[in-house]
Design a protein with these regions (language model features):
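Flexible, glycine-rich loop/tail regions that form catalytic "lids" or insertion modules at the edges
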Residues: 1-107, 116-120, 124-127, 178-179, ...
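Catalytic cores of alpha/beta
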Residues: 172-186
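Catalytic-face loop-and-helix region of soluble metabolic enzyme cores
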Residues: 160, 198-199, 205-209
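Conserved short loop/turn motifs at secondary-structure junctions
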Residues: 6, 131-140, 165-172, 383-387
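Conserved, mostly hydrophobic/aromatic
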Residues: 132, 151, 182, 234, ...
Length: 501
C-alpha cells in the first residue's frame, strides 16, 4: 500500500529484476505468525551441504554445515571457501558476463553457470558460492535473481538439487525484499558485500562492527516478517518455496527460470532484462567527466524527484488538491483532475491500461436501470478505526455517508455510544457497518445492535499478513473508553482472526 510509483513493467526507468516480484501473504487459508511475540517458534539458521537419501540412515546425513544467520559477512564467505572437511566442499562460480557480447554474452554466461555447477557437483562440491565480484568496465553482473531461479530449476530438472546448496555473494541485493526473493528461489545464504561495504563507509572505525551487525540483524528480522506473513516459521521451509507472484514477466522466462510462479499478464523476457542491466552498467562506468554525472542517481522510487521516477502524487498534484479543498475552488480542482489523470503522468497501474469502448456500447435508458438512491446504498467507506484517524474525521465520514444513504464503517476500534443517537440537526454519526476484528476492541451488545451490517474481519487488509499495534502512549482515556481497555496500555490485533478455525 502507498506505492504510487509505476509497476516495474510500466516504468520508463531500468528496473532490477526483484521489482517484478510481489510477496504473497496468508489470509484465511493458513494463519500468519506474529514474528515478534511468536519468535520462539521461528528459526533463521540453516544447514548447507549435500543431502543424502531420506530412506537410508548413515553418518553422511550429519555432514552438513550449520550457518547461524543467512546474511553472511565478507570474512565468513572466505572461511567457507577454505573448508574442505566431512562432506563440506565449497567453490566459487562467477556470474559475470562480457559487456561487449551483449545479449549473446548474457545468455552464454547463464548457460555456462549451469554447466560449471554440474561439473563441480560431479567433483563432490556440496556448496556453490555464486559471485558477482569483479565487475569492471568490460564485465557486468548477471541479475542475481535470474541466476538463482535459472540454476535452481535447472538442478531440479537434472535431479541434482539435493546434491548442493547455493550461496550468493552479490552486490545487487541490499533490501529485505531482495533477500526474501533470493531465498524464495533457492538461495541458502547471501553475502551482500556492497551493502556491507556501504555500512563500513558510513561508519566510524570504532562503530563499524556494531553497525554491520545491526544491518544483518535488521535484514534478517525483515525476512522473518516476510516469511511470517505466509505463516512460515523456518527459513529452511521458506527456501525455494517461491511465495511470490510475478507481475510483468513473460511466459517463456517463467517456464525456464521461475517455473510454477504465477504471472497473469505476461511481460518481458531475457532481452529486456539484459537491456536494463547493460544500462545500469553503462551508467556506472560512464566516460563523462562532468561532476554531476559522477554522483549516484537518487532514482526517486520512494520519494518524488524532478528527474526521477514518475509518481501519481507529486508536489503539483498535492498542491492543487490542498488548494482546491481549502479554498473550495472548483477551477483548481479541475486542474488537479487534469494533473492526476493517466495522460499526464503516463501509465502507472494496470487499470491505467483499461479503456471503455464507448463506440460499440449501446446506451441503456435511465428508466431501465436502478435509481441513484438504490445505487448509493452500496457505497461504503473503508474500515478505518478511530485512533488511526482523528475523532473529527471518523465522525465526519459517518455523517457524510448517512446523508447520501451510503454506509460508513467503524473499523476495529469500536465506536462512541453517544453517536447512536441522532444530533439535534438531524445528522447521524452512527456508522452503519460495525466491524468485529481479531482484537474485538469495543465490541459490546449495544455496539452490535446499532449496526445495519456486522463485518467480521478474517484478516488484515491495510497490513496484509500482519497484525496491528497501537503503542500505549496513544491510548488516551477517550480511546480506552471506546475500546473498553485500560489507558496507557498498548493494544495488539493478532495477525489472524482465531475464530476462523
Amino acid at each position: 500500500m502507498g506505492n504510487d510509483a509505476p509497476l516495474a513493467v510500466l516504468s520508463d526507468k531500468p528496473q532490477n529484476l526483484f521489482s517484478y516480484f510481489k510477496q504473497l501473504f496468508a489470509q484465511v487459508s493458513n494463519p500468519p505468525l506474529d514474528p515478534i511475540r511468536e519468535k520462539m517458534v521461528t528459526q533463521m539458521s540453516i544447514l548447507v551441504g549435500k543431502r543424502e537419501n531420506l530412506l537410508s540412515e548413515t553418518s553422511k546425513h550429519s555432514e552438513l554445515l550449520k550457518i547461524e544467520r543467512p546474511i553472511m559477512l565478507n570474512e565468513e564467505i572466505s572461511k567457507l571457501l577454505d573448508i574442505e572437511n566431512k562432506g563440506i566442499k565449497a567453490r566459487r562460480v562467477s556470474t559475470l558476463f562480457d559487456v561487449q557480447k551483449g545479449k549473446e554474452g548474457f545468455e552464454e554466461a547463464l548457460s555456462e553457470i549451469k554447466s560449471k555447477t554440474e561439473e563441480l557437483i560431479q567433483k563432490n562440491v556440496s556448496v556453490i558460492v555464486l559471485s558477482d565480484r569483479g565487475v569492471d568496465k568490460n564485465k557486468a553482473a548477471l541479475p542475481s535473481l535470474l541466476v538463482a531461479g535459472a540454476l535452481h530449476h535447472h538442478l531440479i530438472r537434472s535431479n541434482l538439487r539435493d546434491k548442493v546448496d547455493l550461496i550468493y555473494e552479490t552486490g545487487e541485493a541490499r533490501e529485505v525484499h531482495h533477500f526474501a526473493v533470493l531465498y524464495g528461489y533457492g538461495i541458502s545464504a547471501i553475502n551482500p558485500f556492497i551493502a556491507l561495504d556501504t555500512v563500513r563507509d558510513f561508519s566510524k572505525p570504532e562503530d563499524y562492527k556494531k553497525n554491520q551487525e545491526n544491518f544483518c540483524k535488521a535484514s534478517i528480522s525483515g525476512v522473518l516478517k516476510t516469511m511470517s506473513k505466509m505463516g512460515i516459521s523456518t527459513l529452511q521451509g521458506y527456501m525455494g518455496a517461491q511465495q511470490f507472484e510475478a507481475l510483468g514477466i513473460g511466459e517463456k522466462l517463467i517456464e525456464s527460470s521461475f517455473k510454477w510462479t504465477p504471472s497473469r499478464i505476461g511481460g518481458i523476457g531475457i532481452e529486456e532484462i539484459c537491456d536494463d542491466y547493460l544500462l545500469f552498467h553503462k551508467n556506472a562506468f560512464s566516460d563523462s567527466k562532468i561532476p554531476s554525472n559522477l554522483k549516484l542517481d537518487l532514482g526517486g522510487l520512494y520519494l518524488w524527484r524532478g528527474t526521477g521516477e514518475r509518481h501519481m502524487w507529486s508536489p503539483e498534484t498535492i498542491s492543487l488538491l490542498q488548494k482546491s479543498s481549502t479554498q473550495n475552488d472548483s477551477e483548481t480542482y479541475q486542474r488537479f483532475e487534469e494533473a492526476a489523470n493517466k495522460d499526464y503522468y503516463g501509465d502507472i497501474t494496470i487499470r491505467n491500461l483499461l479503456e471503455i469502448d464507448y463506440e460499440s456500447s449501446k446506451p441503456i435508458e435511465l428508466e431501465e436501470v436502478e435509481s441513484e438512491i438504490e445505487i448509493l446504498k452500496r457505497f461504503a467507506t473503508g474500515a478505518i478505526s478511530l485512533g488511526s484517524i482523528s475523532r473529527e474525521a471518523h465522525e465526519t465520514l459517518a455523517v457524510a455517508m448517512n446523508r447520501i444513504g451510503a454506509r460508513s464503517n467503524t473499523g476495529e476500534g469500536g465506536e462512541d455510544e453517544s453517536r447512536y443517537t441522532p444530533d439535534p440537526n438531524g445528522d447521524s454519526r452512527n456508522s452503519a457497518v460495525k466491524q468485529v476484528a481479531s482484537g474485538r476492541f469495543g465490541v459490546t451488545t449495544n455496539y452490535l445492535v446499532n449496526s445495519k451490517d456486522i463485518q467480521i474481519k478474517m484478516a488484515q487488509g491495510a497490513k496484509p499478513g500482519e497484525g496491528g499495534e497501537i503503542p500505549g502512549h496513544k491510548i488516551s482515556d477517550y480511546i480506552a473508553s471506546i475500546r473498553k481497555t485500560t489507558p496507557g496500555v498498548e493494544l495488539i490485533s493478532p495477525p489472524p482472526h482465531h475464530d476462523i478455525y
